[in-house]
Amino acid sequence: MFAIIKTGGKQFRVFEGQEIYVEKLNVEPETTYQFQEVLAVGGSNPVLGTPFVKDAKVTAQVIKHDRAKKIIVFKYKKRKKYRCKQGHRQSYTKLLITKITV
């Protein structure tokens, strides 16, 4: 059985026992988190939501919060002596999907 959930402006296809990385959630590590915005549930009886599936929940265990690898943003204008270097690290939350209920 799988589900499609919406979090952080993105959609994820998740299975029970899967580890996923999502945008940072404001919850403590080692706690459980429930996703209420379930767009679809697949398996033997597939269900599509309009826009969400009623009474469907995906439960996940919060493993840790971390930051991604640094990326460099470099702006440059030729012949104008303009250079701007900036770094960015995106925060994320690592989750373990424990249960999908319809």
Swiss-Prot record:
It comes from the Bacteria. GO terms for biological process: translation. PROSITE patterns: RIBOSOMAL_L21. InterPro entries: bL21-like, bL21-like_sf, Ribosomal_bL21, Ribosomal_bL21_CS. One of its GO terms (cellular component) is ribonucleoprotein complex. Keywords: Ribonucleoprotein, Ribosomal protein, RNA-binding, rRNA-binding. The keyword Ribonucleoprotein applies. GO terms for molecular function: rRNA binding; structural constituent of ribosome. HAMAP family: Ribosomal_bL21 (MF_01363). Belongs to the bacterial ribosomal protein bL21 family. NCBIfam families: L21 (TIGR00061). Part of the 50S ribosomal subunit. Contacts protein L20. This protein binds to 23S rRNA in the presence of protein L20. This is Large ribosomal subunit protein bL21. It comes from Onion yellows phytoplasma (strain OY-M). The lineage of its organism: Bacteria, Bacillati, Mycoplasmatota, Mollicutes, Acholeplasmatales. The gene is rplU.
